Amino acid sequence: MDKERISYHESVQKMYERIKKDNMTNVWDRYEAQGIGGVPDRRCTFCMAGARCDLCSNGPCRSDAAKDKRGVCGITADGMAMRMMLLRNVMGASTYHYHTDQTIRTLRETAKGKTPYSIREPEKLRTFAGRLGIETLGSDSEIALYLCEFVEKDFNRPAYEPSRIVEILAPPERKKRWEELDIFPGGIYGEMMLSTSSCLTNVDGYYASLALKAMRLGIAMAYQSQIVNEYCQDILFGIPKPHTMRVDLGVLDPEYVNVLPNGHEPFLGFAMVQLARKPEWQEKAKAAGAKGLRVIASIETGQEMIQRWEEDDAFYGFTGNWISQEAVLASGSVDLFAADMNCSLPVAPLYAEKYGFKLMPVSELIAFEDITERLNYNPVEAGRQAAKLLNMAVENFKNRKNSGEPVLNLPVKEAVVGFSTESILDALGGTLDPLLDAIKSGAIKGVVGMVSCTTLRDYGQDVHSVAVVKELIKRNILVLSLGCGNGAMQVAGLCSPETREFAGDSLKAVCEALGVPPVLSYGTCTDTGRLADFLGAISAVMGVPIPDLPIAAAAPEYMEQKATIDAIFALALGLYTYVNPVPTVTGAPDLVKLLTEDCREVTGGVLNVEKDAVKAVDGIEQHIMEKRKKLGI
């Protein structure tokens, strides 16, 4: 594979050489092997078009819209493609909400004094509870318990009973439109049941109906799962505030005991950092022959952590996003890999055996072949669980050192991380006016929320995302980066002050005046809800509906099921939404037309699909300029 087809990052390119030398299975070779006729991106044409189904025993079926060839049950190509998309959406929503459920569980036990955590942001607790109409006169613990009770009651509302959380948090104009479309949601559990049941054979085969149900589920997910999750994590672990963080694979020093919490849930990661910062744990590592003990942030668990807590010698840095995982594990510097929900590769046991690290599932969702030992997260036991994990890592240090030579001299960069609604307001002096003035004057043409994964489809890891974002800031468009795409920006150096040199003159001047980079590190994919709430605030201050603002969403390298429901929610919110790779719906012409054209008249949002980075940004910029013209700015 060419270097650019492997990754944008030199560190990962170098580690690929090590992996190949060691004859290890890896994501790049596996991707190439899936290609047809020696072309990595060429796959089954029916699968790529979304025109196939294997849900019942009459199948598998293939469909062809041009010939009106339907499934045995009679479903059209459009119905097939949208039904499978909705099932992906359900998986994404369910996984997002599993995280939320664990966060509420953790907040409740913390309020009872049973965890190693504390309520770090009592003001945020009271502000958020107050927004939801919860009594705020009691103690922090009492309010936290009221909050847990309130949100769980809302989660459990049936689909036919409107969600109070959505009613309170969503912008009035959006609520009105959703009610008109009959997509105002009930509780998230009821919505998941409604969507899943609709996908049964011979139930709902109408693509437009299925698309509306997907939007309804997306709205429930964003406001109930994502916003509640992130705001409650803020309450527990701190509101993100800007600070520098070491990033890239060079944060792994083989002379230290290195512990990597990996996945999407940061609970045990935070607990381990609290312990690792204590002198006695550093002494334990030194007694084992190491220079010390470090917790290294990885993927979205790591992203949750680095947004909130500052670096030091115990909480040392961040490796990268999910495609970097095998590169990290093959570095010869990992002692323990704690795998929570999401983004832990099934091949990890092979790497653990080869490179001598301890692989430990810490979520009931995660399982690996031939790995029998596990430590499922329990907030009441979190302190003891974190200590056990650190002990495992220390005890494994000598085994890892004897398992082969580590890779040295990998790069380390610095990124500015930790932007949130609150910290952006702080940077602006407590009001949105400076940002809005910059937009009105044209110094900032518009804002793009880049919520993305990373994928090998069409390009190497992060290559397309970096190209799109560089082109956006060159055209004076401010970028808020989220998800694995945020990790891409950090490791690529685009979240540092030096990035201003890539920005257009007017955006560069604004960023210099505010002391920020033109790419603001805004969190994980779960922060999509936080971003929606921020856009709602901008809409309220400007008195302009969200669909009429000079803003857009972009997912240059979406990959999995969470990403699909983020995109569907963006359409429901009324956003111009750019995605790549091409979704598996091209064999569904009516569905394609609905998403890429007709949706403008439905919600105000529209989907744009484009492989070329410059053409993609052309479309985004054209949309932004049309909105500016309509607003007279």
Curated annotation (Swiss-Prot):
Its cofactor is [4Fe-4S] cluster; [Ni-4Fe-5S] cluster. Binds 3 [4Fe-4S] clusters per homodimer. Binds 2 [Ni-4Fe-5S] clusters per homodimer. It catalyses: CO + 2 oxidized [2Fe-2S]-[ferredoxin] + H2O = 2 reduced [2Fe-2S]-[ferredoxin] + CO2 + 2 H(+). [Ni-4Fe-5S] cluster binds at residues 264, 343, 453, 484, 525. Pfam families: Prismane. Belongs to the Ni-containing carbon monoxide dehydrogenase family. One of its GO terms (molecular function) is peroxidase activity. Its EC number is 1.2.7.4. [4Fe-4S] cluster 1 binds at residue 44. This is Carbon monoxide dehydrogenase 2. It is an enzyme of class 1 (oxidoreductase). [4Fe-4S] cluster 2 binds at residues 53, 56, 61, 73. CODH oxidizes carbon monoxide coupled, via CooF, to the reduction of a hydrogen cation by a hydrogenase (possibly CooH). Gene3D superfamilies: 1.20.1270.30, 3.40.50.2030. The lineage of its organism: Archaea, Methanobacteriati, Methanobacteriota, Stenosarchaea group, Methanomicrobia. Homodimer. Keywords: 4Fe-4S, Iron, Iron-sulfur, Metal-binding, Nickel, Oxidoreductase. It comes from the Archaea. The gene is cooS2. Cluster B is an all-cysteinyl-liganded 4Fe-4S cluster; cluster C is a mixed Ni-Fe-S cluster which is the active site of CO oxidation. Cluster D is also an all-cysteinyl-liganded 4Fe-4S cluster that bridges the two subunits of the CODH dimer. One of its GO terms (biological process) is nitric oxide catabolic process.
